[in-house]
């Protein structure tokens, strides 16, 4: 009995140690020993040097190795130059968790945001200082029209993101859902074209039209399912499969019923 109790106690201790060790695993983010006393520019420079420079270069010139290694989205090099991308691109990739990448070969994908809002603002300011570029947009969906946004979204976006912004797969690339993106992140994505998404300039989609597109996306985040069940909200594919399933069950039941009656006759 005493040995059993000792074994159980030892197991609990080891489990506790393992739990603590797991909780203290580093996230892989390099931070200054103390962020206090650092100006925003200094903090951004140190965070950039520790987490971004390996792929994007010390001065944002990008990394283009002689062997022409290509990264995610077939981008030449480990990381593209950041000179001239402005605060817009940095804010988008950091607030969505697209960056930093654990592997330059993988497709950027929304994941847990690794930096605090203060750190994101610092890195964004530092990247913006590398060269003149676009600032963070300030969209106003309330000034847009949902009906106009629906037509614009159908024309420019639904081919990849589906009619109600549920995302999908296009040319071996996952297309993200838009329902968890903020208005600012949507506006940023439209202007920079992350991964395989095309870039839409203000000549292609004006700020006024962009407000309407965002207003439509906001409206489909909580759709009114008049039929009672949205079936995924991704269009005719699940609806057709559900219809065929119901029809197949009904036909089999009808065949069984007819067979039973013919057997009795």
Put a short name on every predicted segment.
Residues 28-40, 125-147:
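Intrinsic disorder/low-complexity detector
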Residues 38-56, 143-164:
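Sequence/structural segment immediately N-terminal to covalent heme-attachment motifs in c-type
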Residues 72-130, 172-225:
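Extracytoplasmic electron-transfer domains, predominantly the class I c-type cytochrome c fold
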Residues 61-62, 130-144, 158-159, 163-173, ...:
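Inter-heme linker and motif-flanking segments adjacent to c-type heme-binding CXXCH motifs
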Residues 49, 55-64, 83-87, 95, ...:
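Detector for the c-type heme attachment site
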Residues 19-24, 112-136, 202-264:
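C-terminal capping alpha-helices of c-type cytochrome domains
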Residues 1-34:
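Hydrophobic secretory-pathway targeting helix
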Residues 1-10, 39, 237-247, 265:
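N-terminal export and membrane-targeting signals
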């Amino acid at each position: 009995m005493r040995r059993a109790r000792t074994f159980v106690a030892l197991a609990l201790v080891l489990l506790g140690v393992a739990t603590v060790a797991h909780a203290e695993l580093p996230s892989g983010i390099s931070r200054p020993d103390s962020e206090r006393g650092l100006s925003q520019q200094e903090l951004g420079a140190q965070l950039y040097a520790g987490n971004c420079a390996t792929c994007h270069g010390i001065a944002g010139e990008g990394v283009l190795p002689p062997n022409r290694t290509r990264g995610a989205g077939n981008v030449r090099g480990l990381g593209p130059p950041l000179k001239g991308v402005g605060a817009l691109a940095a804010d988008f990739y950091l607030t969505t968790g697209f960056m930093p990448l654990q592997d330059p070969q993988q497709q950027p994908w929304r994941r847990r945001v690794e930096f605090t809002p203060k750190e994101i603002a610092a890195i964004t300011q530092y990247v913006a200082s590398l060269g003149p570029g676009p600032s963070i947009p300030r969209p106003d969906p309330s000034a847009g029209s949902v009906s106009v946004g629906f037509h614009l979204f159908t024309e420019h976006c639904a081919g990849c993101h589906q009619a109600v912004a549920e995302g999908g797969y296009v040319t071996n690339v996952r297309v993200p859902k838009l329902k968890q993106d903020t208005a600012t992140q949507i506006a940023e994505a439209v202007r920079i074209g992350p991964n395989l998404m095309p870039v839409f300039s203000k000549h292609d989609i004006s700020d006024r039209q962009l407000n309407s597109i965002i207003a439509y996306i906001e409206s489909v985040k909580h759709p009114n399912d008049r039929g009672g069940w949205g079936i995924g909200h991704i269009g005719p594919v699940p609806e057709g499969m559900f219809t065929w399933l119901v029809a197949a069950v009904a036909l089999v039941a009808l065949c069984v019923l007819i067979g039973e009656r013919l057997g009795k006759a």
